[in-house]
């Protein structure tokens, strides 16, 4: 028999798995709605239990009701914490993806092209909820405005200095033509290049290129 908090615990498990992934899994729309609905139902139960007392409830005179109220209150509080933890984890992952230079359309394509089972659970064609897509775009705009103050510095670049100035890379998916210090390169799938690492770090982070060796 399901107990209060079981659905919230599932959200926490999803959040824990998300922390170990390089992408963002589908948003659990139905599960979030179910947890929210449980909180509202518990709140209605609390109001119904307290209604006969008209604001004069004394826990010491009705310990059974007091116990029920305590369980309901703690269950609501736990569910809210689970909801906050789930959404905070996804928000942190979204911000990480923005700093890595990922595109919101790439995120939307992860589900359509990959995890069909998870797509059925979320009932949407994107890994993100509409609110997350909006947050992603707005956060990206803020980051662009922030970076614009220091045009000579790539604030989203790696904090570790490269060990090799030039590296061999393989193109995993078409990325079109890019401009480097030594000229233009047309990145077509399965082709290989010997390039300056600083010119392609972002493309490696985005999954377009694979560093060889």
From Swiss-Prot:
GO terms for cellular component: CMG complex; GINS complex; nuclear replication fork. It holds the Pfam family Sld5. InterPro entries: GINS_A (IPR021151), GINS_bundle-like_dom_sf (IPR036224), GINS_Psf1 (IPR005339), PSF1_C (IPR056783). Keywords: DNA replication, Nucleus. The keyword Mitochondrion does not apply. PANTHER family: DNA REPLICATION COMPLEX GINS PROTEIN PSF1, PARTNER OF SLD5. Component of the GINS complex which is a heterotetramer of SLD5, PSF1, PSF2 and PSF3. This is DNA replication complex GINS protein PSF1. It comes from Chaetomium globosum (strain ATCC 6205 / CBS 148.51 / DSM 1962 / NBRC 6347 / NRRL 1970) (Soil fungus). The lineage of its organism: Eukaryota, Fungi, Dikarya, Ascomycota, Pezizomycotina.
């Amino acid at each position: 028999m399901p107990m209060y908090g079981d659905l919230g615990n599932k959200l926490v498990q999803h959040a824990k798995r998300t922390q170990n992934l390089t992408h963002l899994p589908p948003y659990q729309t139905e599960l979030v709605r179910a947890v929210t609905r449980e909180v509202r139902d518990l709140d209605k139960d609390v109001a119904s239990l307290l209604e006969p007392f008209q604001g004069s409830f004394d826990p010491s005179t009705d310990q059974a009701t007091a116990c029920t109220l305590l369980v309901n209150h703690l269950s609501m509080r736990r569910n809210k914490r689970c909801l906050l933890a789930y959404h905070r984890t996804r928000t942190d992952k979204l911000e990480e993806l923005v700093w890595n230079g990922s595109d919101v359309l790439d995120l939307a394509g992860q589900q359509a092209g990959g995890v069909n089972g998870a797509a059925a659970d979320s009932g949407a064609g994107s890994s993100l909820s509409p609110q997350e897509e909006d947050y992603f775009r707005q956060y990206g705009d803020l980051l662009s405005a922030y970076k614009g103050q220091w045009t000579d510095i790539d604030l989203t670049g790696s904090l570790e200095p490269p060990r090799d100035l030039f590296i061999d890379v393989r193109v995993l998916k078409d990325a079109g033509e890019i401009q480097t210090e030594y000229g233009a390169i047309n990145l077509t799938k399965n082709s290989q290049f010997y390039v300056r690492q600083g010119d392609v770090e972002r493309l490696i982070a985005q999954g377009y290129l694979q560093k060889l060796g």
